Amino acid sequence: MRFNIVTLFPEYFDSPLACGLMGKARESGLVEVGFVNPRDHTTDRHRTVDDRPYGGGPGMVMMPGPLAAALRSIPRPGRILLMAPKGRPFTQELARELATGDNLTIICGRYEGIDARLESVFPIEPVSMGDFVLNGGETAAMAVMEATGRLVPGYMGHEESGEEESFSSGLLEYPHYTRPEIFEGHEVPEILRSGDHGRIAAWRREQALKTTLLNRPEILRDAQIDYNDLKILRKTDRERPGRNLYCALVHYPVVNKENKSVAVSLTNLDIHDIGRCSCTFGLGGYYITTPIEDQRRLLDGLLRHWTDGPGVSANPDRGTALRLVRGVSTVEEAIGDIEQRTGQRPTVIATSARGAGDTGFESVRRMLREKPVLLLFGTAHGLAPDVLERCDGILRPIRSLDGYNHLSVRTAAAIIVDRVLGDAL
């Protein structure tokens, strides 16, 4: 496989390309690396490759002319990658894609980036190594070369080495041990010394699953796992941030079609469905807020039926879910109850289909690591303005880029809780 690196600093690669497996692969001819310097394709005596950006602003921009000439000088470029923050995340899956080709060209950006018009002239694919900033694309290009090159047949020597590495099966790798058998009081697990290859394989699979769940749970969403794997994962002790998440279904004050503040009646579906959602995701609690006494009595009777009355034997699962429900008169009462239960005042986040919001789903997920969060869901046509003003934040609408955004509160609650917590959490 041949890599063509378009860079202003070809000397950057001298040491890493000469070391270890990459050095051996180049010596054997499995991997070839060529460099094209845009400075060699300039037309002025100063060999200029950058200029000030149109519209002003800090920094310089790589000029399109030298880069275009550099790309056209490559006889067989193959796919052309541009290392850039805006690009497709580089993953093991993408490395496998790239390894199927014979040629790969990688553009290493510098300064503020390249002239955007270059992407209209050439079939350039932006690729990102992550959400951080480097001085240039050379470090990222080296990572792409190594991850892709080691998938070339013969590169690893023992092909099974690549098959059992992290991400190769969609999971992180299991832990490794070598001599001595005991190191500073810590022993190598007995099963690895047993010689029983079947048990060892099962242990390694279990450890890979647990390591992934505890360190990179988001990977599990796309990993190939079976029912036995799920049983292992369910038994694994892990953080449960859902315990720090609470929700409240607000029936007053909410607004009607005329945008007037009103109180609305409770509905069976809202109570049951959001209760089941809260139980499924392991929430700390679900509050029904209404100041109307007869509505509170109605709620209390319904809850008694399913948690202590005839409903327990008829549908015990529903009773389990509804034990999370607490009736309160106001949002402030719910806040006080959470503070009493947890020792911390919760961060209160409103939900609304209007406006842009000021809090993202990932932000709420991060909050849960530190303190409880109370999500407010409005009935009728949404929470009243005075409720929104007293909140610590307003969640971004579920379909913030589309015009139609009229979900039932039950549907909205399920979607929001799933986005905040996710299956793996």
UniProtKB/Swiss-Prot annotation:
GO biological process: tRNA N1-guanine methylation
Domain of life: Bacteria
Lineage of producing organism: Bacteria, Pseudomonadati, Thermodesulfobacteriota, Desulfovibrionia, Desulfovibrionales
Cited HAMAP family: TrmD (MF_00605)
Stretches the record annotates as Unknown: 242-425
Keywords, comma-separated and alphabetical: Cytoplasm, Methyltransferase, S-adenosyl-L-methionine, Transferase, tRNA processing
Enzyme class, UniProt record, top EC level: transferase
Intracellular or extracellular location(s): Cytoplasm
Subunit structure: Homodimer.
Family recorded in the similarity comment: Belongs to the RNA methyltransferase TrmD family.
NCBIfam families membership: PRK00026.1, trmD
Sequence intervals crossing the membrane: none
Catalysed reaction, written as an equation: guanosine(37) in tRNA + S-adenosyl-L-methionine = N(1)-methylguanosine(37) in tRNA + S-adenosyl-L-homocysteine + H(+)
Binding locations of S-adenosyl-L-methionine: 109, 129-134
Job of this protein: Specifically methylates guanosine-37 in various tRNAs.
Cellular component terms per the entry's GO annotation: cytosol
GO molecular function, one term: tRNA (guanine(37)-N1)-methyltransferase activity
Region of interest called tRNA (guanine-N(1)-)-methyltransferase, as start-end residue ranges on this chain: 1-241
Protein name, as recorded: tRNA (guanine-N(1)-)-methyltransferase
Main location: cytoplasm
EC number(s) on file: 2.1.1.228
